Structures are given as structure tokens and as C-alpha cells.
Amino acid sequence: MDLKTAVFNAARDGKLRLLTKLLASKSKEEVSSLISEKTNGATPLLMAARYGHLDMVEFLLEQCSASIEVGGSVNFDGETIEGAPPLWAASAAGHLKVVQSLLNHGASVNNTTLTNSTPLRAACFDGHLEIVKYLVEHKADLEVSNRHGHTCLMISCYKGHKEIAQYLLEKGADVNRKSVKGNTALHDCAESGSLDIMKMLLMYCAKMEKDGYGMTPLLSASVTGHTNIVDFLTHHAQTSKTERINALELLGATFVDKKRDLLGALKYWKKAMNMRYSDRTNIISKPVPQTLIMAYDYAKEVNSAEELEGLIADPDEMRMQALLIRERILGPSHPDTSYYIRYRGAVYADSGNFKRCINLWKYALDMQQSNLDPLSPMTASSLLSFAELFSFMLQDRAKGLLGTTVTFDDLMGILCKSVLEIERAIKQTQCPADPLQLNKALSIILHLICLLEKVPCTLEQDHFKKQTIYRFLKLHPRGKNNFSPLHLAVDKNTTCVGRYPVCKFPSLQVTAILIECGADVNVRDSDDNSPLHIAALNNHPDIMNLLIKSGAHFDATNLHKQTASDLLDEKEIAKNLIQPINHTTLQCLAARVIVNHRIYYKGHIPEKLETFVSLHR
């Protein structure tokens, strides 16, 4: 164990005597260097504060002049917090004496993590009331929110810490402050079921506001299934009759899909239906649908007590009612709407009803692409689920275990929607796509292409497939490390796209069809690797031969001056007879001479040849 690690471990474990011995013979500069260095992203002081070693904290500050504000990585409940200063770590862990000492030594009371979380928020999160009071007494700002606009009062409400919420309110916390998504502290109470805190907030004049999705605290409680909040708010003076009805119907839908309690759902739906007809002079009927939805098996919402009673004998119809109600009340843009459609589809798939699953998932995917930003993780999850489902169906079909077939149209439809997602992302120039999300979407598309190659098709269908792949390639999308689709097709890491296996990469079939549809075999990634380099790194001679036959330069070099043959295992070269001399032209040799002898060529040869020579740098 090196000295740096030994110092770090001693500070983390509170072994002051050991640390003193380790530093005894070191100069002031050496001590400063050892104390300021990070191990696993954290300084010794940060670890000492995290684990509450008061004597160690004071020794590091007073004897070693450790920097009191330097943040780092700390772990709480399995989550790594980045950029956490020592005061934040001590506050989150509940070490009051360490907090007091750090503040006495000049720590900034409002210093934040990378996500803009303050020490006060950290203390509020885990319910450390005494630390909350101490921080506030030392000028902690109650209104500093994290990157999501979530305040200390909001997190106290969500976590159910009533005494802390009350203290913050007494100190003047803004009860109606909104987060980035429009949530208020009332929403947090509704989502967590904290009824007592909600009542207290209302006493402090909290307003029933809608969030960014149009959700009131009452609807939030219905979505999360907190019946105590729903019962309380449906009797509140600020709640209209229509709002009460919607809340009860939505709560019933939650009982169907989240709690799996069909009788409980019927109870709330009956309450809502009775309210609709309670005033015979002003019956509140459900809106008449413009069209019936095939994915819901053309179901219609029940509109009378008699129709509601008829649902008891048909559980499947009840589940469709839940989806219809949720979509009507929450709207297609709310994440829960598409989530539970997908959930219901997955249940059908588990029971072998793949057709119903595919129909529901397609409907959810259309909803997501119409309402979410390009390359949304939710949309990517839907596309991946399709790839995993189709792979499972094809495998079982091949084993003769499955009656349902995967059609070309099913697969092709999802491929088209996947390409559409890439088009949407590339068109959004003001907000460039996240490379990791784009990489995932590209990988999913390659898996779908791989699956399509396993499905028989007509000449017309084959033309449409290649036309779509051509359109995809013309977008020139790039993933992680600036990988093109062809780079991804020859890389083994493309195999790992989700939890379940779909296709194995490198894939000769996918590589072949990409090349046939116009993929550039000499395209470069961020390290100047061509697909041939990546195929060599993955020891795949068959793909290398295909790339070379398609025009890939065998002796082209990357940023590290390596050719593909430099990267390929020598045994593979001998075994598969990939001899460099067989693929090296006189042009290539001439280009190498120019590069090796540093002959200045720019402006002296045609531009096309300049590009060719640059491949051999």
C-alpha cells in the first residue's frame, strides 16, 4: 500500500495515531500534498467528515492546513454524490459536532455539491433537525434549491420530516415556491402521503397550484395511490366537483395498475359515478371519444352505474378502463400515461399474448414521440423493449415453441420509428443530442437491422428496408467516441445494449448491409480509427476481408500511427491469410514514403490525393 492510500485510509477510519506516525517525518510541503490528494475522488478531510471523526477533522485542519472547501465524491445509501464539500458530508451523515467544528474553522455554510445541494438540504433530507437548526442559525440560505429547483422545504415534506418542515416555515421558508417542473411543497406531501405536513402547509397559506404537467396536489396523490391525501383533499373547500370526480377515477386506475386491487378500483369508480349523477339537473357526463383506440381493443369508458357493475365479470375490460381514464385525465404528455400502457403490454407478453403487447407498445411509442424530446430515455427504453421482445419471439419461433410470428412489417415499423428519432435529434440544432443517448439509439437500430436480416421478406420489402437504412446512413449520425454506425456494427460492445440479449456483435450480416446501403468504409472515429481498425481490435478477420473488398485501406493509420494489421492478433493473420502485402497498392507505398520522409505535399498534388496521403499519416 502506498503512502497516499495509507493516509487516506487512516483519515477515513479515524485512526489519528496512525496518521500522526505516517506524517511525522514528512516536510510541510509533503504533508500538504498528501492531505490534498484524492483517493477514489475524495480527500482525507472529506472522509473524516463523512464518518464523523471529530479529532481527525480538527487535526487535518489545524495541523495539516487541509483545504476546508474542496469537494469530492461521497457515497450515501448506494448513491455517489459528486463535488460534496466536507460540511455537506457531515450534515448529511448527521455529525453535529463535526458540523460545528467545520463552521468554526470557517467553512462556507452554503457551499454546494455539483447538483447544487447545500449542507442544509442534506440535513433536511435525512431528518437531522439539530443540524438544520444550527446551520440556519449560522446564516444558511433556506431558499437555495438544487438543480431541479427543489428546495429544503420541499425535500422535508417529501421525506415526511414534519418538525423540520415546521421549523423552516417558522423561519420564513417560501411555502409556494415552485421547482423547475412546477412542483410545490404540497405536491411533495401528496406524492409521499404526508397528510399532517400538508395540513400544516395549508395553515401557512399554501396554494393548490398545477405543476408543469397540469397536475394538482390532489391528482398527484391519486397517481401515487395515497388514499389519505385523496380523501382529505376531495373534501377541501378549494376542490371543485369535477376535480373530485377526476381524482377518484384516477385513484381507481392506480388501484388497477399499481396496487392490482380491482375491487378497490371499483369502489372509487362507483364513488365518482355517483358524484357525476348526484345532481339530476346537472349531470356531469364523460366526454365522448372522437375515435376508439385499437390498442385498447376498441374499449369505451363506462358511463353509467349499470355499465360499471358489468365490469366485475371482465377483469381485462377493467384494465382497459384504467388506461382510458389515465389518458383522459393526465393527457398523453404525462410519463405515467405511456408507462402504464407499456406495463400492461408487458403483462400481455408474459402471458404469451404478443399481439396485444405489440399494439399497446406501438401506441405508447407514438405517444412518446409526439410529446417527448428527441432521444428521451423513455422513448429509448420503448425502442429497446421492442428489440428485446422481437429477439425473444424469433428465438422461440426457431425452437418451435411459439405460434406467434414476428412479421417484417412489425420490425420494419419500429426501425422506421427509430430512424425518425435520430432525425428528430439531428434536426434539433439548438440543443445537441447527448452522445450517450445517441449511441444507445444507434445501437438499438443496429440490433433491429440484425433482427430484420433474420426475417424473410419480398423483393419490394427488401427494397424498402435498404431504402430506410440508406436514409439512416445519410444522416451521418455519430455515437460515443464519434463512432459511425459501421464502427458500431464491427464492435463487440454494441452487443450490450440492455439487460437482455438481442443480437451478437461484431455482425457480418449487419456490416454487409450497411456497406451495401452506402456506409463509408474509411470513415474515422475520434481516434482516427476506421471500421477496419475496430474490426481488427475485435479480431474478426471475416469482417476485415469484407471491409477490404469494399474499399477499406488496409494500411491507413490512426492517431497512434497504427494500421489495422498492427492491431490484429498475429495468429489471426496467419490463420485467415490476411497478408498486408496482398492489400497494399503501389499508391499506398508511395503515400507511406511521403509521410515517413515528411515530404511536404500540400498544394503540390491534387486535393483528392492529399486526402489519400493523409490516411497514411
Swiss-Prot record:
Changing residue 125 to A: Strongly reduced binding to C-degron with an arginine at the C-terminus. It comes from Homo sapiens. InterPro entries: Ankyrin_rpt, Ankyrin_rpt-contain_sf, TPR-like_helical_dom_sf. Changing residue 434 to N: In a breast cancer sample; somatic mutation. SMART domains: ANK. This is Protein fem-1 homolog C. Belongs to the fem-1 family. The modification N-acetylmethionine is found at residue 1. GO terms for cellular component: Cul2-RING ubiquitin ligase complex; cytosol; nucleoplasm; ubiquitin ligase complex. Pfam families: Ank, Ank_2. One of its GO terms (molecular function) is ubiquitin-like ligase-substrate adaptor activity. Changing residue 77 to A: Reduced binding to C-degron with an arginine at the C-terminus. Abolished binding to C-degron with an arginine at the C-terminus. TPR repeats lie at residues 245-279, 338-371. It comes from the Eukaryota.
